[in-house]
Structure formats: C-alpha cells, structure tokens
Amino acid sequence: MPPKAAGGKSKQIQASKAAAKGSSGGAGRKKWSKGRSREKLNNAILFDKETYAKLLKEMPTAKVITTAVVSERMKCNGSLARRAIKELLSKGLIKQIIKGHGNGVYTKAQ
C-alpha cells in the first residue's frame, strides 16, 4: 500500500478540531457555584415539663407520627423524638403501622 499523500482528509479534520477547541467557551473556565446554606436549627435535647405535656397531648391525636414529625412539631432533635415515640408506644397512646430498620411510621391508637 503506497503512503498517503500529504494534506489528506485526516489532517484537515484534526486542524478543524484544534481550531474549534481553542475558540470554545470564550469566558474561560466555569466558576463553582455558591452552595446554598440552610439556617441552623436550635432544637432542644431535653424535654421540659411544658413540652412534655404538649407531646402527650398533641402527638397521640396526629394522623401520621414519624421521627421527623415529632422533631419538627416539638422542636427537639431526632434522638429525643425517637425516645418520645418509644415512650408513647409503651404507654399505648400510639400504634405502629410500618416498621423499618431505622425508623417507623405510627398513628393514633383508637
């Protein structure tokens, strides 16, 4: 097979690709976007008497009770919310619907 003639098609393609690479973008490198930050929640780590009374009054009447719901309504952290759910369950005020590995879904006991 004889050698290819200089200035073949592949050389032209490579030259056009190199030109396209050099002139793309115009603005240079893309900048990193600023990450959105949420405000820090100052949730309680212990129940005081008023909050505990509110827990015993409000939570057994809720339709859906999860760790997140208790934490949001009572303004307590997640571990305290899990303990509160365990206590309500042991007192028979709520019943379990779904049991997961880390969390569960509960509802009012009628």
Curated annotation (Swiss-Prot):
GO terms for cellular component: cytosolic small ribosomal subunit; extracellular matrix. It comes from the Eukaryota. Residues 1-39 are annotated as: Disordered. GO terms for molecular function: RNA binding; structural constituent of ribosome. Keywords: Ribonucleoprotein, Ribosomal protein. Signal peptide: none annotated. Belongs to the eukaryotic ribosomal protein eS25 family. This is Small ribosomal subunit protein eS25. It comes from Dictyostelium discoideum (Social amoeba). The lineage of its organism: Eukaryota, Amoebozoa, Evosea, Eumycetozoa, Dictyostelia.
